[in-house]
Each structure stands twice: as structure tokens, then as C-alpha cells.
Amino acid sequence: MSFNLADTIRTARLQLLADAMSGGTLTLYTAPRPAIGAAITTQTALVEVAIPAGLTASAATLTLSLATSTVLVEDEAVWGRITSSTDEFVADGDCGLLASSAIFKLKTTYLAAGANLIPIIASFSEP
């Protein structure tokens, strides 16, 4: 079965995601990754990065280039959670190196406390 949407519809769907995360926060955590939207229990928050307001999807793609942030705790970044400006769950995604297929791409996934985390790149697209 094949189902293809018009580019305008694909972009509109991504704009819903952009609106939900605009002005929110991306927090990178240690393992284990919880179930979708589940409470954080044993995971440690390594860094919190502000997401700018006013994000715009274009051509069925939404790309985030987030500002440099200071790492709070030293450890391996395994996954990240995006929350809205009102601290509601938006999305979870995996962390990986720049050349990986991970949602949150980093120069290194091992983060050192007090170091500056160079911009994080995240890309979302509608097939």
C-alpha cells in the first residue's frame, strides 16, 4: 500500500510539531530511555537547551540548530526529550554523532561537565 500527501499537507503537519516545541526545551539524558512521554526516573539530565520561539517548517522539513549550552553533568548522552514552553511532553529522540541517523546529532555523545556543548542539530521531515 502506498499513500502520498501533498507537500503543503506534509509541511503543515511539521508546522504542528514546530508550534509545539517553539519556546520549549531540549534536555539530553543518560540511559535508559523511558516509554514515550513517561516520567523521568533514574535518568540523569546532562544539559538543557532552549528552543527558540517562532519555528517554521518549510518544504516538509523542520531543522533546529540550537545555541551553545553548558553541560551540567558528565556522562553519555543517549536520548533527548523536547518539552513545550509550558513544560508539556512533545517528543523523545535518540542522540548520535553528526554522521549518524539519530534525531539529535552531536560532535560527541560523551559530555563533560562545565564544557560548552557546541550547537545541536536536529532535523525532522515528512516522507
Locate predicted features:
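Small cysteine-rich, disulfide-bonded extracellular modules of the LU/uPAR three-finger superfamily
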Residues: 1-78, 84-127
